[in-house]
């Protein structure tokens, strides 16, 4: 007798057999096709005890059916046809189509039809492990003794033992290392999975998620079988879980039977290290979703109707193929069966492309991608940009040389059939998941966060916990902290305005080596849907979206870029000043309207890009020139700069006292004295939970006092510049103050924006303007520098110089042409202030705009 390990491959031997169930009278047992040649002349019983097949008329014989499906209750040992559990997940001995009047006939289809993620396992051979020939009278045995003898062909999985072990695991397992945050609402001293079954009864979602680490600590052998033979073992788990559930809750009504979903398999592989030994095994990989397809209908059961006599029949899909009936069983007409689509059964299917995470990539390598297929309720569970741990079965499918020829290539195509998604990342903030919002925080954690929010110095403590290794820059850290919290989302569509931007945009600019990039990297590693990109290595389509041909459907599809992938997150853009003009132009719509309009290759759509932009830029001369404005230093268009709520300068002061304090701070990162070790720092996990809770549950609204304070602040800002003929504020500055005030109220866990929030927003906004919008010639804050690209004094000086030049030309009399160089020297000699060539050119352009003169080459001609 061959052992299970030496049996042929289960892939090759999953076809059905037409054998009859064993009888207790000693008749010859018909062997499977592989054994038929050896036993056709023999009168003794064959070595292998076959499985009864489904569609034959053997339903009247309860012996074969009781073997797999009879309930443990003693009253059901004499099972009749109506008592057979025909909806068992393993479909051993079940009919190939639905049978009317079966138990739970209201459930559409068996779990084998409802679990396309496990592939087709309708007909599975079983092997008798006993090497001795049993006597004829010994064949009449109990269900338990027969179950102990049988394993699934090609494996060492004993169905009865496997089911018994899993039931024992569900009923007894208590996790000694369980954390309360991960098991909200569960008693950690009671069996976890029995409480999960109770949740299923209350909520009605028939999915039981099983941690493979729990299974491995409870039963190593059962865990090994699950990893090696998931296609055979998971249906057994389904069967065991359903038996426990319906025995405990017999009156419960579910949409379909409970499906067990294992996750966190120890066989976690890097995506690039998957190899042929992992095929058909349970694996867990991690990565970032970069593309999801549309929902694809996949046929599970075909409905055929005879065109002659209207006889109907159903055929299940086996390994992606339909066995079309060639002869009608009712009228014996050949080739008369037609497929009726609207009577067939379909399941949802979706293709997901998963890309390797940057932290898993070896140095100098490009990221690998793999194809996932999600089925039924796993469709639309993840979106592009999500970082997920995926548990599934690794598959290899042949590729045909020609679709019309059955020859296949020797190289197979691989994919993963998804069984479980887990959107978790310990290093990042909790993602806002609509399904798990209520389960994110325990009552104790919420109480601790609210106690922390009641402290008067919580704003400063949170800011100091943000990037503690970076010295000083308190106002910049406070601005980034408010960006992480964000404002309150509002909808003004009834007024015709549309959506009001709630995200805060921040620009950091200054000398090289002032830790701008470190701040960006810190924020990128903190937020759940963050993207990090560099200005020089980014293109317009890489930031927005581009059209590509889908390799599966050969149709044009839209591939999203960094700004769309960071929707509801933060997009960090380094080297912002080195972007080319076409790349920067796509940011205008995103930074104000929070949408992205696409019209390419016949695809016209508008994508959501509700992302905050945190950008860093270096000055053109490699060092900040205090005699130039911000726009002149970083060479960015004023239309883009005006969309940033806060623009901070990070300059190197070149002061000995500052240098000494900075050096002391850097050395302290490597060596801490006892006094420094005693200093209290806010835990990083607390900071993440604090921000996540505020973003999810705190939505402050403006109060009456805060509204009046905002109005007064805006009027005061306008009043400052009106006396000097310059504009010091625009409506965008007022909206920025509103967003910053709401974010500061979120820091305090306040549902109402108060005057204290407006005062802090005013102070932070004023500090940023002091640095970025100060006119270097007058030392006065002039918002026109950011909105129009030129300060009011520069504009006034330009107009005055143009008038002086005009008077100089008029004093020369009616001369039709003047030499450029001579006119420039005459102007310099007449003017008291120093006149540069650029200023002279600007004056000429101003007069040219008035149609007073024109410049051709080195000659100035009057009009």
UniProtKB/Swiss-Prot annotation:
InterPro entries: MCM, MCM_4, MCM_CS, MCM_dom, MCM_lid, MCM_N, MCM_OB, NA-bd_OB-fold. Gene3D superfamilies: 2.20.28.10, mini-chromosome maintenance (MCM) complex, chain A, domain 1, Nucleic acid-binding proteins, P-loop containing nucleotide triphosphate hydrolases. It catalyses: ATP + H2O = ADP + phosphate + H(+). GO terms for molecular function: ATP binding; ATP hydrolysis activity; chromatin binding; DNA binding; DNA helicase activity; zinc ion binding. It is found in: Nucleus; Chromosome. It comes from Xenopus tropicalis. The keyword Nucleotide-binding applies. Belongs to the MCM family. Its EC number is 3.6.4.12. SMART domains: MCM. Residues 458-667 form the MCM domain. The gene is mcm4. A motif (Arginine finger) lies at residues 642-645. GO terms for biological process: cell cycle DNA replication; DNA replication initiation; regulation of DNA-templated DNA replication initiation; response to yeast. Its main location: nucleus. Keywords: ATP-binding, Cell cycle, Chromosome, DNA replication, DNA-binding, Helicase, Hydrolase, Metal-binding, Nucleotide-binding, Nucleus, Phosphoprotein, Zinc, Zinc-finger. It is an enzyme of class 3 (hydrolase). GO terms for cellular component: chromatin; CMG complex; MCM complex. Early fractionation of eukaryotic MCM proteins yielded a variety of dimeric, trimeric and tetrameric complexes with unclear biological significance. Specifically a MCM467 subcomplex is shown to have in vitro helicase activity which is inhibited by the MCM2 subunit. The MCM2-7 hexamer is the proposed physiological active complex. Component of the mcm2-7 complex (RLF-M). The complex forms a toroidal hexameric ring with the proposed subunit order mcm2-mcm6-mcm4-mcm7-mcm3-mcm5. The heterodimer of mmcm3/mcm5 interacts with mcm4, mmcm6, mcm7 and weakly with mcm2. Component of the CMG helicase complex, composed of the mcm2-7 complex, the GINS complex and cdc45. This is DNA replication licensing factor mcm4. Hyperphosphorylated during mitosis in a mechanism requiring cdc2-cyclin B and other kinases. Undergoes dephosphorylation after exiting mitosis, existing in a partially phosphorylated state in the cytosolic interphase mcm complex which associates with the pre-replication complexes (pre-Rcs). Complete dephosphorylation inactivates the mcm complex, preventing its binding to chromatin. Becomes actively phosphorylated during S phase once the mcm complex is assembled on the chromatin. This chromatin-associated phosphorylation occurs during the activation of the pre-Rcs and is independent of cdks.
